[in-house]
Amino acid sequence: MNAKIIALLIIGGGLGALTRYYISGVLPVYKDFPIGTLIVNSLASFLLGYIYGLLFSGFDISPEWRIFLGTGFCGGLSTFSTFSYETFSLLREGEIWLAFANITTNILVTIFLVFLGFILARR
């Protein structure tokens, strides 16, 4: 790994993390449901699907941009660990149905948004 790749990852990941921090801070928790985490994971999933859709349709995205946007920005924007902790917290608080809704919603929505981004990019 060279210095250019490291810089792209640091900058992309940092911008993604700042975006996640801002979005999560602006959005309130909706009736104990961690909506901010769902939104940042959804945005990252859609963007990553869109990037790969462009690649599969023959759009030329340089390896540097793929690293910056995909691994860096989308990696910094999304957060599996926060999703896991929030689900654990809901379970610990006895909110079994909210925990189940959090798991189901995050997984189904993010997979669908990868698919949607992929399809929209290929049009």
From Swiss-Prot:
One GO BP annotation of this record: cellular detoxification of fluoride
Annotated membrane topology: Multi-pass membrane protein
Pfam families xref list: CRCB (PF02537)
InterPro entries: FluC (IPR003691)
Regulation: Na(+) is not transported, but it plays an essential structural role and its presence is essential for fluoride channel function.
GO cellular component: plasma membrane
Iron in keyword set: no
NCBIfam families documented for this protein: crcB
Known function: Fluoride-specific ion channel. Important for reducing fluoride concentration in the cell, thus reducing its toxicity.
Full protein name: Fluoride-specific ion channel FluC
Gene from which this protein is expressed: fluC
